[in-house]
Amino acid sequence: MFEKVNPCHPDKVADRIAGALVDLAYKKAENPRIAVEVLIGHGVCHIIAETSVSLDKADVTAAVHRIAGNLTIDYVEVPQDGHLADNQADGVRCGDNGIFKGMPMTEEQKTLSQIARDVFSVYPYDGKYILDGDRLILCQSNVETQHLREIYPDAEINPLGDWTGGTDVDTGATNRKLGSDMADSVTGGGLHGKDLSKADVSVNIYAFLKAQETGKPVTLCCAIGDNTVDGKPYTEIVETARSYIRSSGGFEKFAEWGLV
């Protein structure tokens, strides 16, 4: 049983905005410290950014408008806490306490992830999809149900009829669709709106990739300030995640679909 949402679901719109701001921070510094929370809906986008580099309000506004439309923006930016900053003063260390799990993807998860991408490539609007054994449920906005039924004749499609979706119908918040992003690898923390020093980003990515490579579950934990995780220097964990994010096209692009 697995649920997947597409990049235009309001929660994913929030994730994408958060990712775009992290991308902005990385344009200003090689290793910025930033954590972004976004709440969006009904014409308003609220953002709080804790960051070691100041972001230009015009760049923030441009990112929000590009991703979510011409919304009213409430942007609050504050410096990173001094104790947290001191943790990274002499090198990259684990940025938080955490527990982490990497799980090999199931065939069901792979199948639904591909279906979600296929549908979204034709209908780039808010949508949510479920696969439970042989039961496929497709909720796709801004489409005539009959069109999807021709492609997926055995699926349950838009059970309440055609709908519009988007942030004028539903609110979105950062890291609220972790099941969609991580499948069985969900544990304590979210992937989005954070720099690579954050274990929620780097260790989650590392554990997920290791699970796909080995075909076995991976369980890890770390304490803030740790220099090693899974017997590897934390800097190596971070570089693994950095390469993955780059291969995805950056933090905003990574936020579209997550790891799955």
Roles of regions detected by a PLM:
Residues 1-260:
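A domain-level signal for the structural core that forms small-molecule/cofactor-binding pockets
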